[in-house]
């Protein structure tokens, strides 16, 4: 069974620090206030946040462990279903160890580049 499509989402051309409306929307989607600063990097066509990019360090100086978060409720449900059905294992098997290792290295590079000096 295929899930119905969601309205198209688009990447933000240039992410800006979250507006007050973005902060309120993300807090509602998470069910709590975000721990640190973030930018909305993907939005639904109507402007609602879909993916946020977290600042690499939380206000208290602790590193933020997750750089990007999917916050859209419908897409989170769909991803959760895929994960519960073994989708992560299938995807990892399809792309192979070398591609996964390269993806992890690129993530580390982007994370490290964003860290304050």
Predicted regions and their residues:
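Short N-terminal edge-element motif at the start of the domain
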Residues: 1-54
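An exposed acidic His-Trp-rich patch
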Residues: 73-117
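Cysteine-rich micro-motifs
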Residues: 65-74
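A generic structural signal for short, non-catalytic loop/turn and secondary-structure boundary residues
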Residues: 44-45, 63-65
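Intrinsically disordered regions, especially transient/low-confidence alpha-helical propensity segments
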Residues: 5, 65-66, 104
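Short, glycine-/Ser/Thr-/acidic-enriched flexible segments
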Residues: 57
